[in-house]
Amino acid sequence: MSKLYEWIIPESDVLDKEEVQVKPPAMYKVVLNNDDYTPMDFVIEVLQKFFSMDMEKATQLMLNVHYEGKAICGTFTAEVAETKVAQVMMHARENEHPLLCTMEKA
C-alpha cells in the first residue's frame, strides 16, 4: 500500500510568498463644455441618460456648464471615461448638436 501523504511537496520546493503592491487605476474627469447652440434641455437629458443624474442635479450641472464654461460630470477609470465621452458625443451628433464632451486626468 502507498502512504497517505506521499504527494506532499517537499518544503524545499515551495516558493516564498511575494508581496505584490497593487496601485489604484488612474482616474479621469469627464467634462461637458459649453457652446452657444446646444439646448439646455438636451444637456439635462444627456446628464440624466449617461450619468444617472436626477432632474435637480442635472439642471444644476447644466447651469454650471452654461455659466462657468464647463463642468465635471464625474470621475471614472480611463475605460469608463472613454466610453462615456464616446456615448455623449455620438448622442449629440445623432441629434445634430455640437456639444463637446472631453476627459482630463484627475
Curated annotation (Swiss-Prot):
Superkingdom of origin: Bacteria
Pfam family, one: ClpS
InterPro entries: ClpS, ClpS_core, Ribosomal_bL12_C/ClpS-like
An example Gene Ontology biological process: protein catabolic process
PANTHER family attached to this UniProt entry: ATP-DEPENDENT CLP PROTEASE ADAPTER PROTEIN CLPS, ATP-DEPENDENT CLP PROTEASE ADAPTER PROTEIN CLPS1, CHLOROPLASTIC
Assembly notes: Binds to the N-terminal domain of the chaperone ClpA.
Entry function: Involved in the modulation of the specificity of the ClpAP-mediated ATP-dependent protein degradation.
Membership in a protein family: Belongs to the ClpS family.
Protein name in the entry: ATP-dependent Clp protease adapter protein ClpS
